[in-house]
């Protein structure tokens, strides 16, 4: 089971090394950094658009990064069916680039939120969640100031009807409540995929919890899902 990971790096990215560490050091996969000024992704199986504050979050989170030269090839790769995984700021970039529906707004509290967060699995049938089970509750940390997912009613209805929601913020026993929602995201949405299922945006940080030494390793399940999918496709 082997996959080639490309981790996109923008000015202001600060979770790129965490994503690289998870793929290369923890899972022993081929991985490399891809600078924002590059024109081609090269030979990769999975593109990770990592967290951080790309371009200082000027204008709004992800708004400048989506115009980086490398994003043209990220869009091309996604449209060709390649796996693209946006984490936190990466989620914001993918929404700005039109690869995912909706947008991310300032947290309802107007405060930065950084804590471990229980998440209920809604769809375990995607390349990003196949190592999980529907209804399972996992815990992954969040760390963001603009993580409130929003879409209009028509878009939300389509997302829900297509089973595009992967994870929702929940209590430890799986109840989706306002109190369990750290940022005010509509429908408690923490992560979702595009209609084709090959592009994922996730506000929590699975790359920060792939080793039990750090207090939890539920994030491993996301990376294991990606490796499972790549292995099946390669076969």
UniProtKB/Swiss-Prot annotation:
Record-annotated disulphide pairs: none
Keyword annotations: ATP-binding, Cytoplasm, Glutamine amidotransferase, Hydrolase, Ligase, Nucleotide-binding, Purine biosynthesis
EC numbers: 6.3.5.3, 3.5.1.2
Protein's UniProt keywords contain Nucleotide-binding: yes
Gene3D superfamilies associated with the record: 3.40.50.880
Glutamine amidotransferase type-1 domain boundaries: 5-235
Signal sequence range: none
Reaction equations catalysed: N(2)-formyl-N(1)-(5-phospho-beta-D-ribosyl)glycinamide + L-glutamine + ATP + H2O = 2-formamido-N(1)-(5-O-phospho-beta-D-ribosyl)acetamidine + L-glutamate + ADP + phosphate + H(+); L-glutamine + H2O = L-glutamate + NH4(+)
GO terms classed as biological process: 'de novo' IMP biosynthetic process
Enzyme active site: 88 (nucleophile), 205, 207
SUPFAM superfamilies: Class I glutamine amidotransferase-like
Pathway membership: Purine metabolism; IMP biosynthesis via de novo pathway; 5-amino-1-(5-phospho-D-ribosyl)imidazole from N(2)-formyl-N(1)-(5-phospho-D-ribosyl)glycinamide: step 1/2
GO MF annotation list: ATP binding; glutaminase activity; phosphoribosylformylglycinamidine synthase activity
GO cellular component, one term: cytoplasm
Subunit structure: Part of the FGAM synthase complex composed of 1 PurL, 1 PurQ and 2 PurS subunits.
Known function: Part of the phosphoribosylformylglycinamidine synthase complex involved in the purines biosynthetic pathway. Catalyzes the ATP-dependent conversion of formylglycinamide ribonucleotide (FGAR) and glutamine to yield formylglycinamidine ribonucleotide (FGAM) and glutamate. The FGAM synthase complex is composed of three subunits. PurQ produces an ammonia molecule by converting glutamine to glutamate. PurL transfers the ammonia molecule to FGAR to form FGAM in an ATP-dependent manner.
PANTHER family in UniProt: PHOSPHORIBOSYLFORMYLGLYCINAMIDINE SYNTHASE SUBUNIT PURQ
NCBIfam families: FGAM_synth_I (TIGR01737), PRK03619.1 (NF002957)
HAMAP family: PurQ
Protein name: Phosphoribosylformylglycinamidine synthase subunit PurQ
Gene that this sequence comes from: purQ
């Amino acid at each position: 089971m082997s996959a080639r990971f490309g981790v996109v790096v923008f000015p202001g990215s600060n979770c790129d090394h965490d994503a690289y560490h998870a793929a290369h050091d923890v899972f022993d996969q081929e991985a490399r950094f891809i600078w924002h000024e590059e024109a081609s992704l090269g030979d990769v199986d999975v593109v990770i658009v990592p967290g951080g504050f790309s371009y200082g979050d000027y204008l709004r989170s992800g708004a400048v990064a989506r115009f980086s030269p490398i994003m043209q090839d990220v869009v091309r790769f996604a449209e060709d069916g390649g796996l693209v995984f946006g984490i936190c700021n990466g989620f914001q970039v993918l929404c700005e680039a039109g690869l995912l529906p909706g947008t991310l707004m300032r947290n309802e509290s107007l405060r930065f939120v950084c804590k471990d967060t229980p998440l209920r699995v809604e769809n375990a049938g995607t390349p990003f969640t196949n190592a999980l089970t529907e209804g399972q509750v996992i815990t992954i940390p969040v760390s963001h100031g603009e993580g409130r997912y929003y879409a209009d009613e028509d878009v939300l209805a389509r997302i829900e009807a297509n089973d595009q929601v992967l994870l929702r913020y929940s209590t430890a026993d799986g109840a989706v409540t306002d109190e369990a929602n750290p940022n005010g995201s509509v429908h408690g949405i923490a992560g979702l995929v595009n209609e084709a299922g090959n592009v994922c945006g996730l506000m929590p940080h699975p790359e920060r919890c792939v080793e039990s030494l750090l207090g939890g390793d539920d994030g491993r399940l996301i990376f294991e899902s990606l490796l499972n999918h790549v292995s099946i496709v390669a076969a």
